[in-house]
Amino acid sequence: MKQLNSLYNSNAEELLGRVTLSGKNIFNRSAYILVTNEQNTPKGYKAIISAHDFSDKISTPCIKVDNISGFNEGDVINISPNGEVCFLYEINSASNAIFATARCNHRCIMCPQPPVQQERDRTDFNLNLIKLFDKNTQEVGITGGEPTMIGDSLFEIIRQIKKSCPKAAISILSNGVKFADIDYAAKLAACNHHDLQIDIPIFSDIASIHNHIVGAKTFYKTVQGLYNLAQFGQQIGLRVVIHKQTYKRLPQLADYIYHNFPFVTQVAFMQMETTGLAETNLKDLWIDPYSYNNELREAVLLLNDRGITTYIYNAQLCVLTPELRPFAKQSISEWKDVYLPVCDGCVLKNECGGFFSTNKNNISTHIHKIECTNSCTE
């Protein structure tokens, strides 16, 4: 998520609020954080953020930052006692998500966010956060950690999204293991959300390889979870993170998916984000994305030709062959999506997924500017 560090903070407790730039009626201010450079600082707001100094007489919590240009009307931010400002919801973003928990029942060798064993329950905080979302929000993710680790509280979050953002599609990133419990899968279905998809990773058609990658012997629980979700008519996406230990069997995995999970809504093959445990295990995981184009091509075309919607996430168009580029999606969250100087002037830059900001030291040696397409020579 996007974060700012304050230069001054008079606040001694955590504050959650919706940003307003224009001000609110005095009877409707208590949930808002006013962001302004005006010297006049009205009362009644949860906090005031400015790039100017504050008077010592102001009783409202005050936070000084370098610049207020990054704030937008309707953003939702959290201000910690140490003055860190976290953007938990951005009104202009299509990548807003609820972080359900940092706990997980897997320890994937390439996890960008290593799990914790214990933490404070976030459910009440998240329910209050969702209430501050704009009612016209089009999509909300639920992520972690492993969201099902919070048990039935997951369904409270889904119902609150449904109430506060009735138009929003929901995407849940889960390892699928908990859904091997058919009663739990039934509870998800009972939420009766109009547009909810569970995205579940599967890393190999061979159980032992998958289990090694996720750090747990759960392959068949994930498979059972997929069948239970399908039994209740849930939308399911499959995700495959590509690295040195998964790329060789991509075609076999694609064939396995087609024969065993023909009911899935989509399959996404994903370039790896090299932070967290992925960085720790980089020597065992890193392979230049250009080097697995043949395996990726075979897997993508196998599924696509058989009617399964197939995408490529987090990939740079110049690394993919022209045949694969139509499958690539801009999937990296805006706050950590960057481009390199070599990308300047590329005719496909606006369509390209870019790079994870955390991946700057681990990029393909085949990155280059595309100066023309179709019959031209790149």
Which ranges hold each PLM region?
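Flexible mid-to-C-terminal extensions adjoining Fe-S/redox cofactors in radical SAM and related proteins
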Residues: N11, P322-E378
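Short Fe-S-cluster ligation motifs
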Residues: I130-M149, I367-E378
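Conserved C-terminal portion of the radical SAM core fold
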Residues: V140, D195-Q197, Y220-K283, S291-L317
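Short, electropositive alpha-helical surface patch
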Residues: R159-K162, K248-V264, L320-D337
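Core AdoMet radical
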Residues: C111-T123, N136-I150, K162-A180, N192-V223, ...
